[in-house]
Amino acid sequence: MPTNTTRLLPLIRAVLAATSALALVATAQAQEAEQETSSDGDSTTLETLVVNGGSGGVITAEGYVGISSATGAKTDTPFLETPQSISSVTEQQLKDRNPQTLLETLAYTPGTRVGAYGFDPRFDAFFVRGFDVTYTGVFRDNLRQPAAVDSIFKNEPYGLEGVSILRGPSSALYGATGAGGLYNLVTKRPTEDTLREVQVQYGSHDRYQGQFDFSGPVNEADPVYYRLTGLLRDADTEQVGVPDDRAYIAPAFTWKPDEGTKLTILGEYSRTKTGGTATYYNDPATGRATDIFAGNPAFNDSVQKQARIGYEFEHRLNDTFVFRQNARVSTLNIDADWDFAYGPNADDPTLLDSVAGTYDERLAAFVIDSQLEAKFDTGALEHTLLAGIDYTKLRFRALDGRGVSPPLDTKNPTQGRPVDPIDFNTRTVQDQWQLGTYLQDQIRYDAWTLTVGGRYDWVSTDTDTTDLATDSLTTISQKDKEFSGRVGLTYQTDFGLAPYISYSTAFLPNAGFNKETNQPFKPTESEQEEIGVKYLLPNSNTLITAALFNIDQKNGLYLEAVGSSNIQVQRGKLRSRGFEVEANTSLDNGLSLTASYAYTDVKIIQGPVGTVGNYVSSAPHHIASVWAYYTLPEDGPGAGLSIGGGARFVGSSYGNDQNTFRNSSRILFDASVGYDFAAIDKKYEGLQLQVNATNLFDRREAVCTAGYCHRDQGRTVIGSLRYNW
């Protein structure tokens, strides 16, 4: 048996055992609940977080279990009726695991590959089902969150109330998206009940953070509610010269004059300071990562400022029609310096030659989505018909400069090296707009739900590149248009089992041109066949899902060596096939658990010479995880205590598309312990202490993607003291 499979078996068994035990425990609890209900007419249930799922894709959840969301259909739809693999990271999971990045937030979701670039606080780069979704798959409140080059919006987990995940091609509703699917980040919204929280944190690498979250009615007379969330952090990291400082503020207001009308304003501003590079030097002789920081602590600042403001409006016209409109304006500016050691000096092998650079990028985007929902019957058929039109306009500007820097001294690799100011060499300006119109009908007959949807998009992109030394200008204009669709069928049994089958497509316009042919790139297209089952155990807060999928992507972009440089070419085709299973529960006995396993086989069907028939780099066949959190009984000796623990398995993978070397498999462990001081005395009610650790055993192995090697992020421990009143 292959080594990686042998190492995987214990965790797979643990995941499957946890899933089986979960079903047995939940079934037993359901039987007890039925007995209690029959005996006294009442039963104990978990508190349900019910929010309006018609706007922004917010989640209705009970503990760890997502029940419904608008992410899968743009209308509030139960997960059991969504004919596609969908899951969620709920607000309770965020509280228990206290993630500090989006990657940590998503680490326990099935099929999500985080850590492919090791420790790197600059970007939230991740993959799903073998496809990169960093640029194409991140949405905010059901609206596209654009990104370009290094201008990728940073996402603060403390500003989220959850994440909805729709896997697979999803252009039928959302337009330009990739083959892997989309991750909808749900912003914290005003609550009708008063909420007050302040928190201080201290952690590894001199990490200091203070944060607050206030919400409730503005006054007792007006139907206006507010929320104000913010934090301030001063922190170093495991890499010298790479801080992780952040200031974040997010105001929100909701006006609800009647039950049929609602307007929510969502805003945010943040400033983040980190490093221009965080990578380790790769020895060209071996191609592997060393322990030497490849950057320059004296020339490695990266400051990113971003802001957004938008609204969600919903108005019920009558018993049949509801109108919604969501819109957002967002801006991002990143100013960074970087210095990178790339090879031994010819005269002194203890020195490493370096190259330095600087860039200034600005991204501005406007997104608006208008939709009309109608619910009506035609005979025995119940319809939820959705018609909409959305528009995205973005402008991206980049100034880039390259220069020289002193060599890195391997005998003192953390010493800063002075770098002279670097002038900008090129200026790139890109303007893009996308207009899409879509129609979807969810048709219900008895236990059957047929979902049929289609969309047509028009995209126009103009790119101007100026060589500032010669003042020469290159202009590329391209226009794309494409139809996307989805059809799916779901059957719901009386006992909570819901098998489904679906077919969906996606398209993604590509900016730039092929330097070999001087022709614009065609859009990247993908299609998926998926079959699965979802099981919501009766009278138990437990959801188990499983899916089989096949995804074909064509006209993908690849880097290919031509002469002494790499250029983008388009002649690729990828195929991803796999299986996923996930289980989530939050039981009345204080136990919450999430477990998942994903098998993914991603191959290059067409691509650069030497890669055809190979596996995509850093795409493991096996990913599995288990996280459990238990709150001890209030009347027992451990009253007030909560403990949690998790394990994340990442199977072996190839380090490049040529498949000449491999990344080893690894298991990373996380842990949590908390204490509620109200167990000592009621006068301490609302005061809680929590300590979270990620990569508990500090495993920091090399991980290589696209031929370049990084290192896993090491152990971090964060203590939090929280007070709610």
Where are these regions (language model features)?
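Outer-membrane beta-barrel translocator/receptor signature
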Residues: 158-161, 167, 172-251, 257-261, ...
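Gram-negative outer-membrane beta-barrel transporters
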Residues: 447, 550, 570-656, 700
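Face-selective signature of the C-terminal outer-membrane beta-barrel domain
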Residues: 309-332, 355-466
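Membrane-embedded beta-barrel scaffold of Gram-negative outer-membrane proteins
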Residues: 314-316, 320-328, 332-340, 523-586, ...
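Acidic/polar loop-and-plug regions of large Gram-negative outer-membrane beta-barrel proteins
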Residues: 233-237, 249-316, 329-363, 402-434, ...
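Acidic, small-polar-rich N-terminal luminal/periplasmic segments of exported/outer-membrane proteins
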Residues: 21, 47-194, 198, 506, ...
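Structural signature of Gram-negative outer-membrane beta-barrels, strongest in the C-terminal barrel
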Residues: 254-258, 268, 363, 382-386, ...
